[in-house]
Amino acid sequence: MLGIPGGLTCFPSSGVGALHTGTGAGIIFPWEDGLDLRLHQAARLGSRSMSAIVDFECPPLNEVICGLHFRRMDRFTAPYVGLLWQKFQTHYPKCEVHPPLTLVSEQDTELQLEMSSFPRVWFVSEDSTRLVQVQQDLLIHNWRQVESSTSYPRYKIVKDGFDDALSKFEAFVADHGLGAVEARQYELSYVNFVPQGDGYESLGELGRLLPDFAWRRNTSRFLPDPSNVNYQTVFDLPNNNGKLRVSIQDALRRSDEKKLTRILIVVRGMHQSQDVSTPDDWFELAHEWIVRAFLDLTSEEVQVKHWRKK
């Protein structure tokens, strides 16, 4: 479900469920299922600009995903894909076809899965760092790191790319009488990869990177250090605006057999309150929670020494 430097192969985990929005390539995940620790956040943190919260010179960020799941548009069928690509082709000259994705809604009290036989189409930029994914009930804009030298263009640019893609898609379906884009759920996801050696040398030392996931290491205990980890935690956003999910997994980069820890932070939901009353409000809230969650979860020593927190 990820996009990482090219030339790699991915065996995705079922980890966080819901929108499976990443771009796949490059990482092996040993686990299929994980420990589900359900935690809850009581109140919204005070509002501050992201620049006032944090800035890293070398962040471990690998991919950012902005997505919208909408009511399925059955009239948007295969013949329209080529016509839609024409609207994107100037900035996304490459096109790929992939199997459709499934939504698991954070808003429903009961688990609801919807499958479609219609494929998912990728419109990919020339340098492969940006892509738009479209299917009958889904639109996603991704930024991904394809080379180690590729720098993150900042959240606003990724969000602007999503807004532009959504505007083009809404105009297209209106022009062709395919129906309206009825939003059901938004998503913002950040994917980070931290190599072993950046503050920790093994999974037994994972607490030096992620203090909440420390492994007790002493000679009197029976169990050795873990060989694999797959932790998941869930936090409620305020006023029923959605959930924040954190997934911690060990992984292996195929290109150099480097051991990594993936920190995936996903927020899904809808604007449900007076202070979060528009899609832009919701994405701002989601972005704030992701940034603050990352700071809260990771050790300050690693933030300063390895990611060069300013």
Describe the function of each predicted region.
Residues 60-68, 132-153, 181-191, 259-272:
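Glycine-rich, often proline-containing surface loops adjacent to acidic residues and nearby aromatics
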Residues 256-310:
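Long, compositionally biased interface segments
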Residues 119-131, 181-256:
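Aromatic/basic-lined ligand-recognition segments
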Residues 160-182:
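Secondary-structure boundary elements
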Residues 27-28, 32, 36-41:
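Short, positively charged and aromatic/hydrophobic N-terminal segments
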Residues 13-14:
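Serine residues within intrinsically disordered or low-complexity segments
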Residues 43-136, 140:
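N-terminal low-complexity, intrinsically disordered segments
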